[in-house]
């Protein structure tokens, strides 16, 4: 993920408002590989900056997604997750006990829709989600 300074410059270049609240969200995402929910980002940001609103967090995440700087994932956990790792192609491991989400490096390629089922369909993205229990929850 880009640095807070790079994201600040990008937002300004695109005519988007840059506020201390948004810069805090940039920083929280930059230092995070846990695929946080928008709500957990809000809780952390609000604890440090009481002027933070949930709407600001949602709007900032939406703008980051529109700029291609984060992916917003629905992993079936009940909350949308924010993935700041857009540089590396990867899939996800989701623990069904604790909800932890980890990146899984893309070690298998070539997954595609069989030609007899395509019927003119063009695949833009493939996301594979493995559900199970993490090491801590398995013990």
Describe each model-derived feature in a short phrase.
Residues 2-15:
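Short, Lys/Arg-enriched N-terminal segment that forms or immediately precedes the first helix
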Residues 20, 31-37:
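Short capping segments at the starts of secondary-structure elements
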Residues 23-28:
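Pre-recognition alpha-helix immediately N-terminal to the DNA-recognition helix
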Residues 40-46, 57:
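A short acidic, leucine-rich amphipathic alpha-helix
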Residues 57-67:
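Basic amphipathic alpha-helical segments that dock to polyanions
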Residues 66-139:
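Non-DNA-binding regulatory cores of transcription-related proteins
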């Amino acid at each position: 993920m880009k640095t807070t300074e790079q994201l600040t410059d990008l937002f300004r270049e695109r005519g988007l408002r840059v506020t201390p609240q948004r810069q805090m969200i940039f920083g929280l995402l930059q230092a995070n590989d846990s695929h946080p929910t928008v709500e957990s980002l809000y809780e952390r940001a609000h604890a440090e900056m009481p002027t933070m609103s949930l709407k600001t967090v949602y709007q900032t995440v939406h703008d980051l997604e529109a700029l291609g700087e984060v992916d917003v994932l629905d992993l079936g956990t009940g909350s949308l997750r924010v993935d700041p790792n857009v540089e590396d192609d990867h899939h996800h491991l989701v623990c069904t006990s604790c909800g932890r989400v980890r990146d899984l490096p893309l070690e298998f390629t070539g997954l595609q829709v069989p030609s007899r089922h395509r019927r003119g369909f063009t695949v833009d993205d493939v996301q594979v989600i493995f559900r199970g229990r993490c090491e801590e929850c398995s013990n």
